[in-house]
Amino acid sequence: MIQIFFLGTGAGSPSKKRKLPAFLVRREGLNILLDCGEGTQYTLMNNKLGINSIKIIGITHMHGDHVFGLLGVIASMGLLDRKETLYILGPRDLKDFLYTSFEYSKFNPSFKIEFIDNYNDQNITIATFKTCHTVESQGYLISERDRVKIDEEKLEKEKIKDWRVMRKLKEGKTVEYNGKFLKPEDYLVIKRGLKVAYTGDTIPCQSVIESVKGADLLIHDSTFLNEPSAFTYGHSNVADAAKVALEASVKLLALTHISPRYEDVTEHLKVARRIFPKSILPDDLSYITLK
C-alpha cells in the first residue's frame, strides 16, 4: 500500500486555495517528500505528518516554488534533534544552494545529509527521469518491487491449511502433503509492485511518456487550462497531461501545479476526462491510497 498526500498543488506563488508544490509519499514507514515549496514545513507540522519521519527528499528543479521550502524543513529537522541520515536527490546545483545557504545562515546540521542519484532497498526503488522544462529538471519514479505471494484461493480449494506447507512453498521448496507432491510454481503468484510517477514542471515529451509507462499514478504538470504559450514557459496545459497519461497507459492521472489565475477548476477536470477519464484534480491536503 502506498499513500500520497498532496501538500501543495499550486504553481508560482501560493493562492488562498493552493500552496506551493510538495507531495508526501508513504509506504510502510518510509516517507518520501517530492519537491518542497515555501511553507512545506508548516503544512507538515500543522497536520502532524512527522517532519522528522521523512527519510528521502527529491527536488525536481531549482525554481523557487519547488525548492524555497527546503532550507526551513532541514532547519526544523535539526531543531527537533534529528539523528538519522537525510537522503536528497535533485539537480546538480542543489548541493551548492543548500550548503551556501547553511554557511550564510550559520546553520550546521546535526545529522548527516547524503546526496544520491537513486535509491534502492528491499521494498522499493526511486529512479529519476528526464523532463522537459526551461532549466535542468528531472522527474521521479517510485516503484515497489514485485512480490511473491501464496495463491490462498487455490490452497483453500484444495483444503490445504497447514502453515508449514505454505511457508515451504513460499520458500520455493517442493512439499509432500497427503501423498501428493506440491510444486511451488503451482501455488505462487507474482504481485506486481505499485508505481508512482511525478513530473514536476514539464511540457509533454517522449522521455516522460517512456519513463512513466504503466504507472499506477501519474502526477503531471497541468499549469494551464488552455494557454497557447504554455510550452514557452516549460509547462503543460490540462489536455497535454491527459494525452501523456493516455499514451503512457497509466492507471490514474493527478493534475497538479495549477496556476493561481484559476479559482474554479471545474473545466480543467472536464477537459482532462474527455481525453483520459481516470483523471483527478486534488485539493491541498487531500490524499489517495493505492493498493
UniProtKB/Swiss-Prot annotation:
The active site consists of: D65 (proton acceptor)
Q: Which cofactor does it need?
A: Zn(2+)
Which branch of life, at top level? Archaea
CDD domains named among the record's database cross-references: RNaseZ_ZiPD-like_MBL-fold
Record-given protein name: Ribonuclease Z
Where Zn(2+) 2 binds, per the record, is at D65, H66, D201, H257
Q: What is the lineage of its organism?
A: Archaea, Thermoproteota, Thermoprotei, Sulfolobales, Sulfolobaceae
Catalysis: reaction(s): Endonucleolytic cleavage of RNA, removing extra 3' nucleotides from tRNA precursor, generating 3' termini of tRNAs. A 3'-hydroxy group is left at the tRNA terminus and a 5'-phosphoryl group is left at the trailer molecule
Q: Which family does it belong to?
A: Belongs to the RNase Z family.
Gene coding for it: rnz
